[in-house]
Amino acid sequence: MAFHIPEVSPAAGPPARTDFDLLEAFRQRYPFPLDPFQEEAIRHILAGRSVIVSAPTGAGKTLVAEFAIYRTLAAQRRLAYTTPLKALSNQKYADFCRQYGPEFVGILTGDVKVNPRAPILVMTTEILRNLFYTDPMEDLATVVLDECHYMGDEGRGTVWEELIITCPKTVQLVALSATVQNIAEIADWIGQTHGPIHAVHHPVRPVPLQTLLCDQEGRIATVEGAGRRAAEPPRGRPHGWRDRDRRRHGGDFRRRPVHPSRLIPELVERGWVPTLYFIFSRAGCERALEFYLERGPSLLDPRRAAEVEEVIAHALRDYPSITPESELNALVFRGLRRGVGVHHAGMLPALKRLTEVLFERGLVKVVFATETMSLGIHMPAKSVVIQGLRKRSDAGFRTLTMNEITQMGGRAGRRGIDLEGKCVIGLDTPEGAEEARALLARPPEPIESRFRIGYSSAALLLMTYKDPPMIRSVIESSFGQYQNRRRIRELEARRGELALRQAQAEGFQSPCCELPTLMRYRSQRAILERERQRLPGFSGASRRQRKAQAAAWSLESLADVRERVTALEAALAQMPCHRCPHRGPYEARLKRSRKLVEAMEGHRRAQEELEGSYWEQFLRVVAVLGHFGYVKDGALTPEGRLIGGLRHDNELLVARAVFSGAFDGLKGSEAAALLSCLTEEPRETARDAAKAFLRAQGHLRRRLQSLELLAGEVERVQDRYKVPLSFSLHSALMAATARWAAGEEDWAGLVDSAYGGHEGDLIRAFRRLIDLGRQLVDSPDLPERLRPVFVDAVAGLDRGIVLESALI
């Protein structure tokens, strides 16, 4: 169906009457009135002002972005819609194609390029960041930054800051953020960096949320009442549940929350489904589904079960790759047919999408999901269960943040359907209620900058700005430096306080002792203490000092030491300060003054580090590039320009490999296998398959060894210049990549024999590898002899189930 909106002249901006018509036409698209915060944000957009909207999950932030799209199309201009995740970009692309027509919408995600000249272009933040540096979009009017709170993400936050810094000042920004503590600070930084921006903060949820706690036995209570009185008992135990099941699925439960099979019947009986059940591991999600299918009843009546069969049949026709060949796929299909699903990043994209569709239609009542489902995927529920307050991280287990709880809990409560959403938090110890109450009483955490200078960022800055002061100005426009300036102001204020206290301490004068006299007394007393420590049995001597005493006695008589101690004591007693009643307070003031001076010096050093930290970081990164000859006289060589064009965390090692000859003479499938060593290492693989592959492929084993030498050199140079950037080198994907790129057709057999992990992980690894290969092919600085090799590598990978998953 053709998309129609009132036309607006882009030349001078829409007149007031047209603004009114445009807004009224937009209102007619929705069966409900706009909320006041949406109206406020829309009026800023109509006035051409940038806006940042902070509101809870499900409050309707996306509607503000949809108006920006509506207005952009009316003005016949272009809009870039950025998301932090490829899956979210794919979802937005599909949504916008349905709303506005595929002719108006395009997508750029690195491995996928569809309709790149469209007026509405969905893309990841990395893509738009690079476009701003190298090839700005023509006629770009607006940039939407969806999930803007991702600016605080450890791995991806830098890109968000770079995008805002490099965005042309003539482009309107529409930023959408979850509720965070420092939205005003973020808005102030954007205002200083890009231009005036108006913050619209709406903390109220459209559907009220009740947070409850569930103990290890399945008793649900209010946050205030949990653990303080007898909680409400569960209304029924799942059929077949026995004490031996407790032992099998959780031991004595000292550190385990209630098992899902115990809680789900309670949720069903209370009418709190559909439910998103968050479990912080893939294996935990799969075990929960498997155990429920063993013991729990179906959650579907016959009519709903028939609808599920119809949707599954349709999905199998569209995506034949999701047939239940693997053990996980078979488990998922069994669950869907009984109204229970699972959702995590290791699943096939098409199978995840099928689960989402069934959940949205109310045909799946419970989905066991990892927390990735809380990041923008549209799956509103009646209730949310968070299984425990602790999750595993790289450094061990840690407590959830308030932002994480808010993000997950925010999925509960469907607008226009539920009067109230329910967020049930599982307690994993009998004493967990107090910990939960303390955590839930905290405000949302502030967004902290994760800005860092990588090799690609440094190369792009050198390509774009020739003048070092300009580069420094751009770097110090970062949110990280903005927050550093706040810390510097705090340090300056603290130094001022310390200086005042130090002056007061220095100003104290003893009525009888002058400072030089007191200092001579203290010096003599210190000498006396050292001599006393040499005497046997001195209580103040340490173990090391006592060992030193024993050695000294063999060289010097004990009598000599005692004689010196006696003489020093007598001399000290004759000094005027020895019996002075004012000496103690004077010494205390003097000691306090010295400590204050040391503290001020520490604050001064910290301030200096904050003032130049990012610029120093940039200089060190450029020094590494210069060491390898990728920067000469302040200009990039072809190798450096190639690095600048890569959206990849391993960009330096990739460039070293490309220009070292590591890929010379290889076929496309072999080049793909070797390039896979430079991508992110997968979570779980069949290590034996990789070893067997390398034993059989001696020439690739030698190429890998050459990469290991290059990696060792990079590590040594980074250590020398104090550049703590990580890089990756592994062989885990080589066997699967080589076989698939060479034309292997048996996907299930490939996953089982050459990979050993989750199918979804392998799909994602191949999509990333395709993206990296295309970046190399598109680079004008790639050696021409390698271009056809990487073209063949990409073509061999981008087919079958891997291609089918590109836009899911």
Question: PLM ranges: what are they?
Answer:
Residues 1-51, 208, 300-337, 597:
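Helicase-associated low-complexity/disordered flanking segments
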Residues 43-51, 61-77, 161-166:
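Walker A/P-loop NTP-binding motif
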Residues 76-130, 188:
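Conserved nucleic-acid-binding Ia/Ib motif block in the N-terminal RecA-like helicase ATPase lobe
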Residues 82, 97-106, 278, 282-366, ...:
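Conserved C-terminal RecA-like helicase domain
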Residues 125-127, 134-174:
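SF2 helicase catalytic motif II
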Residues 165, 172-174, 179-291, 341:
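Conserved interdomain linker/interface between the two RecA-like ATPase lobes of SF2 helicase motors
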Residues 337, 341, 360-364, 445, ...:
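Non-catalytic terminal extensions of ATP-dependent helicases
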Residues 379, 383-393, 398-440:
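Conserved segment of the helicase C-terminal RecA-like domain
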